Amino acid sequence: MMWFRRDLRLGDHPALAAAVRTGEVAPIYIRDHSLATSERRSSYLAASLQALDESLGGNLHVFEGNPVEILKKLSAQYGEIFATEEFTPRAILRDKKLAKAQLTINHVGSPYAVTPGRVRKSDGTPYRVYTPFYKVWCAVGWRAPSELPALPKWISPPPDARKFPKITCEIPASGELVALDRWRDFYKTDLARYDEERNRADLNTTSGLARHLRWGEIHPRTILAELNQTEAHDVFRKEIAWREFYADVLFHEPHTNLDYYKPEFSRMRYNEAGKAFEAWCHGKTGYPFVDAGMRQLNAEGWMHNRLRMVVASFLIKDLHIEWQHGARYFMEKLFDADVASNAHGWQWTAGTGTDASPYYRVFNPIEQGRRFDPEGSYIKKYVPELAHLAASEVHEPWLYLDGLSHGYPERIVDHATERHEALARLAELKPRS
């Protein structure tokens, strides 16, 4: 029996290859309702499962309920259980419950090129800083993509094992074939300029692979195997390593999905998440680059990575709201929402995490817009109330007579004032001499 989890593909799948070597395989997926999810992630999962089912010739068994109870019944019927190992706090807790119930899972492979916990210092402790982690991560290396030993014979599901979730909202294209096509297209068209253009919000030059990696529709090994030593390829390799670094950090510090990596920041003065938070959520802060990012997130379930940092900095250091509020909102809205990358991406910007940008680094939302959306085309796409303004005006519409004439809101705070306030609150944490 092959238990699919965050690995919804057939290619480069060590656990599936191991299961196939034992003979006939029952491919299964269990919908565990004890795990909270958003409408967007649930709908994306539904589409990805449908794509996987097509690849399996309509033989995917989909169950609904408690994994322990379901697997007890299935193991008596089908025998050995194979699965890709998972490393999030909830997945580890689930697998401990399975072990307590004396259910043996044959874990083969992981969602990462290098399994969390393998990259360590010479004294055996985990890395807290990305750059030395990256060097050892590269030195540890990864296997070549695996192949299925032969076309397996799938065990057909009974009628009561087809409990697919429903698609209840608009979703982007999903599935293994889509992921592979996207990777090939990015490799041919945009990867060569990735080091120069990846931060430009107005250029559609990012990989678009985040959601496919999150759901295991493509394995990072498949991508890494095709990268060379050019500057652009090296920068992209480092971005994949950031994902693996954050997974490693969360593996060693599982409380940091919701709590501070640096506990002293829990003592900082924060504001309640009231009307200002609502304005941030809806893209109505009065800062065009911030609002464009939030409106893209709300409309599409995705946001450019540069914008993720800018809007996070604005929430934490301009509005003085704790990072967890923003992280939860991202988890609700993003199709690519990943516990480790989301929590530690937020903590990096907040200055509270491992290898973090220091708290005193405050992104200027106006200058960020000018630098990474110089003509204002990204802003105008998502904030049409500013489409009438020239490129020189769109980043500070409040300075111009007709800047707010089409319904765009006034600024809810003054950035310069709130930057000083953020630094003052940071100073309060320092011990007095």
Where are the model-predicted features located?
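Soluble or luminal CAZymes and related metallo-dependent hydrolases
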Residues: 44, 48, 90, 175, ...
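Trp/Phe/Arg-rich N-terminal binding region typifying the photolyase-homology
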Residues: 1-145, 232, 341, 424-429, ...
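An acidic- and aromatic-residue-enriched active-site/binding cleft used to recognize and process polar
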Residues: 5-7, 30, 65, 86-87, ...
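Residue-level preference for long, well-ordered alpha-helices that form the structural scaffold
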Residues: 41, 45, 282, 286, ...
